[in-house]
């Protein structure tokens, strides 16, 4: 080994950064590049290569570097030095940009000497200087502010006063003539001016094709033929031409023997029909003066095709029909007309896409597909009489026997004797009934007094008066209706004869019944009830004293008596939160 490992260790070895820069083992930062002293590092590398470095321990040989290591260290020094130069150039460029931006800034603060000329005049100071009357004899009482002159603006004064710099032309130095004594040595890095000079791109040239012919231009007749697609005359003409072409094809095998003597004639007609050579046709006609034409061809002497040679396809108004015999014998000489694009037609698989009306009606008349809707015939007897409905409440077998017995008992029609009015009673029976009513009234009064006393003695029960109970019971008895509804009476009376008329009785005057006065609840009864509740329970509230389902009048009466007892300091009524329970506690004067 020609070097020690501690030389290349990172952060400790003297060649660690150079070794990493040469081998690119890891990424280096700017601080590591700038920490390398290039001059000192080069001297140390030279000392190691020339074996001038002392051994770290006495007695050991001097450290040496191999050729590979010395080459790698030299490459590393070059890369570190190049990166340091890059950092230096970037810093200089950054500083120059800052200086340039600082020079471009315009001074916006005005100097104190320029402020008075740019501000409005102080009227108070002018009045003091002019003794309160600036030129009073000439009628001038104020001084208008003057606008500042552009030459007084400090920002652009130096720009207006400075002269425009002239453009200096660079003098071209004469080219130095090469010394003939010195041989021409062209460096490998220098290229010739022809190589580095930009040249214009050559235009793309189209290759010429031999035998290429330009297509004839579309004439006016062709355009009219293409535009007039909906014209019926053109369609008919095309059909006629199609028929003529079919006839020509059929007549070709018959006329093969006659085509040989007409070869020259066909060549002349072809040249006559081609657009660019009208003169050749005349030359051919003059060169063959003694040619004998058949009688069919001599008929074409009256037709002048020279007027149609200027266009490829002649217009429609100048087109003259040729004799049928010539067209039959010269099928290949006529120029094929451009095919007209037909409109795209929809193809249907079925020839008849819609059924005819007669066939449709015929299919509707057949009864194999359209049957009449069968009308459901109801049974002959669907409705039941009211008597049958009253006798049978529901379907048989649905009601249990107990309910069915009650229904049959209530559904019985009353007898006739019960429905008749009671006969005229005698005076004795009336007096007996009055005596019985008085006895019953006395008994009810005695019972009501007893119930009031019992309620006072037993206040733990609900605070409801016996009279109220008796009245409610009487109202319930009055509100009860008879088990037999009046409709049944009407149904039962329909089928029976009317009862005989009874004599009218004189109306008796109604005696109003005076209800006994209801005894009001006293505070002593409320106090007893509260005392009994407090003995049973430690805490007592208003809801336990008066049940929630008690009458409103009773609740208001008890609440009023509680307020009276609280004012007398016998009871204390408290409510801790709104809408909370009313707590009832004994007061200071509670017995």
From Swiss-Prot:
Tissues expressed in: Expressed primarily in the gonads. In the testis, expressed in pachytene spermatocytes and in spermatids. Not expressed in spermatogonia or somatic cells. In the ovary, expressed only in oocytes. Low levels also detected in a number of somatic tissues including thymus, lung, liver, kidney and small intestine.
Disulfide bonds: none
Processing and modification events after translation: Phosphorylated.
Species the sequence originates in: Mus musculus (Mouse)
Positions bearing Phosphoserine: 149, 192
The protein's assembly and partners: Interacts (phosphorylated and unphosphorylated form) with SMC3. Interacts with SYCP3. Interacts (phosphorylated and unphosphorylated form) with SMC1B. Does not interact with SMC1A. Interacts with RAD51. Forms a complex with EWSR1, PRDM9, SYCP3 and SYCP1; complex formation is dependent of phosphorylated form of REC8 and requires PRDM9 bound to hotspot DNA; EWSR1 joins PRDM9 with the chromosomal axis through REC8.
Compositionally biased residues, Acidic residues: 425-438
Family label: Belongs to the rad21 family.
Region span, Disordered: 163-186, 316-336, 420-447
UniProt name for this protein: Meiotic recombination protein REC8 homolog
Phenotype seen when the gene is deleted: Mice display a high mortality rate, both during embryogenesis and after birth, germ cell failure and sterility. Mutant females exhibit ovarian dysgenesis and lack ovarian follicles at reproductive maturity. Affected males have small testes due to arrest of spermatogenesis during meiotic prophase I. Early chromosome pairing appears normal but synapsis occurs between sister chromatids rather than between homologous chromosomes.
Composition-biased stretches (Basic and acidic residues): 163-185
SUPFAM superfamilies xref list: Winged helix' DNA-binding domain
Domain of life, per lineage: Eukaryota
Any one cellular-component term (Gene Ontology): synaptonemal complex
InterPro entries: Rad21/Rec8-like (IPR039781), Rad21/Rec8_C_eu (IPR006909), Rad21_Rec8_N (IPR006910), ScpA-like_C (IPR023093), WH_DNA-bd_sf (IPR036390)
Subcellular location: Nucleus; Chromosome; Chromosome, Centromere
């Amino acid at each position: 080994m020609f070097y020690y490992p501690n030389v290349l260790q990172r952060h400790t070895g003297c060649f660690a950064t150079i070794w990493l820069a040469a081998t690119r083992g890891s990424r280096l930062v700017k601080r590591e590049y700038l920490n390398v002293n290039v001059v000192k590092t080069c001297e140390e590398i030279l000392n190691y290569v020339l074996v001038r470095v002392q051994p770290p321990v006495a007695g050991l040989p001097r450290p040496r570097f191999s050729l590979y290591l010395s080459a790698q260290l030299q490459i590393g020094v070059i890369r570190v030095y190049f990166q340091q130069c890059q950092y230096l150039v970037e810093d200089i460029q950054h500083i120059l940009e800052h200086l340039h931006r600082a020079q471009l800034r315009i001074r916006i603060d005005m100097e104190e000497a320029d402020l008075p000329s740019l501000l409005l005049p102080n009227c108070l100071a002018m009045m003091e200087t002019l003794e309160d009357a600036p030129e009073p004899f000439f009628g001038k009482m104020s001084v208008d502010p003057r606008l500042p002159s552009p030459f007084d603006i400090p920002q652009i004064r130096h720009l207006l006063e400075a002269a425009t710099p002239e453009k200096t032309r660079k003098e071209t130095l004469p080219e130095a003539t090469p010394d003939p004594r010195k041989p021409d040595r062209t460096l490998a890095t220098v290229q010739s001016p022809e190589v580095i000079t930009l040249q214009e791109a050559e235009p793309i040239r189209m290759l010429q094709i031999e035998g290429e012919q330009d297509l004839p231009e579309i004439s006016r007749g062709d355009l009219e033929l293409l535009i007039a697609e909906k014209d019926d005359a053109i369609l008919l003409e095309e059909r006629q031409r199609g028929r003529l072409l079919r006839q020509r094809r059929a007549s070709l095998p018959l006329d093969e023997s006659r085509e040989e003597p007409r070869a020259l004639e066909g060549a002349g007609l072809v040249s006559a029909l081609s657009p660019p050579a009208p003169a050749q046709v005349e030359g051919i006609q003059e060169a063959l003066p003694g040619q004998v034409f058949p009688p069919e061809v001599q008929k074409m002497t009256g037709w002048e095709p020279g007027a149609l040679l200027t266009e490829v396809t002649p217009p429609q108004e100048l087109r003259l029909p040729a004799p049928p015999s010539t067209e039959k014998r010269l099928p290949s000489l006529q120029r094929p007309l451009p095919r007209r694009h037909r409109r795209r037609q929809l193809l249907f698989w079925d020839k008849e896409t819609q059924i005819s009306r007669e066939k449709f009606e015929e299919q509707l008349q057949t009864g194999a597909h359209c049957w009449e809707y069968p009308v459901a015939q109801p049974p002959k007897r669907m409705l039941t009489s009211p008597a049958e409905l009253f006798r049978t409440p529901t379907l048989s077998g649905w009601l249990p026997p107990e309910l069915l017995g009650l229904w049959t008992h209530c559904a019985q029609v009353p007898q006739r004797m019960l429905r008749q009015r009671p006969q005229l009673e005698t005076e004795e029976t009336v007096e007996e009934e009055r005596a019985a009513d008085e006895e019953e009234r006395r008994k009810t009064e005695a019972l009501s007094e007893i119930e009031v006393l019992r309620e006072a003695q037993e206040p733990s029960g609900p605070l409801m008066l016996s009279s109220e109970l008796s009245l409610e019971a009487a109202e319930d008895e009055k509100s009860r209706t008879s088990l037999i509804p009046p409709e049944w009476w009407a149904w039962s009376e329909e089928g029976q004869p009317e009862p005989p008329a009874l004599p009218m009785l004189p109306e008796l005057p109604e005696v109003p019944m005076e209800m006994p006065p209801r005894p009001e609840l006293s505070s002593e009864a409320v106090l007893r009830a509260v005392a009994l509740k407090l003995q049973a329970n430690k805490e007592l509230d208003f809801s336990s004293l008066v049940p929630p389902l008690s009458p409103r009048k009773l609740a208001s009466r008890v609440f009023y008596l509680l307020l009276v007892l609280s004012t007398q300091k016998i009871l204390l009524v408290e409510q801790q939160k709104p809408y909370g329970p009313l707590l009832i506690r004994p007061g200071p004067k509670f017995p």
